[in-house]
């Protein structure tokens, strides 16, 4: 299943660890937004990993599931995702 994962992490070192964890499984489409294609097992593992990295009092992390129809109808305007890593 497809997911959009967005985060707002207060501390740089925590933000970098979250970003690294998400780069392992997804495509960075904005500086704090990733698209991931995950089966239920990998999603559960990722949620556990991310939960251990964030501070629940100061940080936010949202996981939005996307059905296939919605995912394939999505559009991008402006810079393509690959330009973020340049």
For every predicted segment, state its role.
Residues 35-59:
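Short, intrinsically disordered low-complexity segments
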Residues 52-86:
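C-terminal structural segments of small proteins and small subunits
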């Amino acid at each position: 299943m497809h997911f959009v994962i967005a985060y707002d992490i207060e501390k740089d070192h925590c933000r970098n660890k979250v970003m690294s964890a998400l780069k392992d499984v997804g495509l960075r489409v904005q500086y704090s937004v990733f698209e991931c294609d995950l089966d239920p097992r990998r999603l559960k593992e990722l949620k556990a990993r991310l939960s251990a990295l964030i501070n629940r009092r100061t940080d936010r992390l949202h996981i939005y599931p996307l059905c296939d129809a919605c995912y394939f109808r999505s559009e991008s305007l402006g810079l393509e995702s690959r330009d973020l890593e340049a």
